[in-house]
Design a protein with these regions (language model features):
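Vicinal oxygen chelate
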Residues: 2-17, 37-85, 89-118, 129-159
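Hydrophobic ligand-binding cavity/cleft-lining segments
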Residues: 21
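N-terminal first-folded block
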Residues: 25-27, 31-42
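Conserved active-site tyrosine of GNAT-family acetyltransferases
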Residues: 26, 30-31, 94, 119-122
Length: 163
């Protein structure tokens, strides 16, 4: 029998771990380009690092071989989703060190404004701002198949601003 959330200890954080091909290159990217700080590097030679930005931790681990670096792939699935206070500020901050925004900004039907960047190992990072209090601009179309028992329903959503 599963324990209820009232009988479990409270979760306090989640910390992604990215397996990377070149630890120093990844540290440089996340610090210089994405604003992470305080890299705590471990190992001799270095093989692990812990970075932080605004209380959000990120772990980087050096791959023993290149085939162990496994981003979610080119399908557009994110490896990390970061909620930010102001996406316009993030876009401006990313432009300064010359980061290319791979996708966005895009207003999504679930009330988030998102941009995507790709790190040197191909990990796709989505930075997003809650826009639930704003009118939607053109939104991305979302489609999929909803399996409801024996029936399958094809669902296509496209939301646009009424303005």
């Amino acid at each position: 029998m599963p324990l209820s959330s009232q009988t479990r200890t409270r979760l306090r954080a989640t910390t992604p771990l990215l397996v990377v091909a070149n630890l120093q290159r990844s540290i440089d990217f996340y610090v210089a380009k994405l604003g992470f700080v305080d890299p705590s590097v471990h190992g001799d030679p270095p093989c692990f690092a812990m970075l932080n930005r605004d209380g959000f931790d990120l772990m980087l681990s050096l791959a023993e071989s290149p085939d162990l670096v496994r981003p979610n792939g080119p399908s557009g699935v994110w490896d990390i989703y970061l909620s930010v206070a102001d996406i316009a500020d993030e876009i401006a901050a990313l432009a300064a060190p010359g980061i290319t925004i791979d996708k966005g900004p895009t207003d999504m039907f679930y009330q988030m404004r998102e941009i995507e960047v790709i790190d040197p190992d191909g990990y796709r990072l989505c930075l997003a701002q809650d826009i639930s209090g704003e009118p939607l601009r053109d939104c991305e179309t979302m489609s999929g198949v909803l399996d409801i028992g024996s029936a399958k329903l094809r669902l296509v959503l496209q939301l646009k601003s009424l303005h």
